[in-house]
Structure formats: C-alpha cells, structure tokens
From Swiss-Prot:
Coiled-coil stretches: none
Assembly: Homodimer. Interacts with PriA and DnaT. Component of the replication restart primosome. Primosome assembly occurs via a 'hand-off' mechanism. PriA binds to replication forks, subsequently PriB then DnaT bind; DnaT then displaces ssDNA to generate the helicase loading substrate.
Name the record gives this protein: Replication restart protein PriB
Gene: priB
Any one cellular-component term (Gene Ontology): primosome complex
Domain SSB: 8-108
Organismal lineage: Bacteria, Pseudomonadati, Pseudomonadota, Gammaproteobacteria, Pasteurellales
Length: 108
C-alpha cells in the first residue's frame, strides 16, 4: 500500500495512434480477443533537457464489453488506453511487453 492509500501495482496508461489494423480472434473457450499496436510520440523534460519519447506497444483487448469498442478503431486514430502490462512470448521465442486494456477512450 502506498502512503497515498492507492493500490497501484501494475497500472499503465498511454495515449497514441493506432499503428496497424486490429486482428480479431476467438479463444477455444469462446472469449473474443483483439490485438493491435499503439504508437506514442511526445517530448518530455528530463534532468532539465527536452527529449523525444517514442514507443510502439502491443495492445490486447479481451472480453465482450471492450471488444464492441474495437469495431470502430481505425489506423491513425488516437486513443487513450489504460490497463496492465505483462510479457508474452512471441512465436520466435522473444518476450514482448503487452498492454492488456481495461479502459479505452477515443480522442478527437
């Protein structure tokens, strides 16, 4: 527990643009999934200097409530994604950081 009484141990939020078309599938247990990449670019102050921040991260969306929101996601659209991060092992054996979305907000 933090001094602020917040229970935050794995919380991540990122604003960025959708970098590719969402890929949808259904698990053997019948759960709908959607995967796409979000690209973030910004300028941040660090140690008194401005630096460019850039990342491209996989976004995993699962379950019926959020999957409905993915129907209107298009490449280039700006989103706020909030969720938790975990590592997935890709088919080539490399670990990749993935943001599992719990909240999605479209930014105009």
């Amino acid at each position: 527990m933090l001094k602020s009484n917040l229970e935050v141990d794995n919380r991540f939020s990122l604003i960025g643009k959708v970098a590719d078309f969402p890929k949808r599938n259904k698990s053997p247990s019948g759960i709908d999934h959607c995967l796409f990449y979000l690209e973030h670019r910004s300028n941040k102050k660090e140690a008194g200097f401005t630096r460019q921040a850039w990342c491209k991260i996989a976004i995993q969306i699962s379950g019926n409530q959020l999957i409905e929101k993915t129907q209107s996601i298009t490449v280039g659209q700006q989103l706020l994604v909030v969720g938790f991060v975990t590592s997935h092992r890709s088919s080539n054996g490399l670990n990749q950081l993935v943001l599992h979305a719990e909240q999605i907000e479209f930014i105009e």
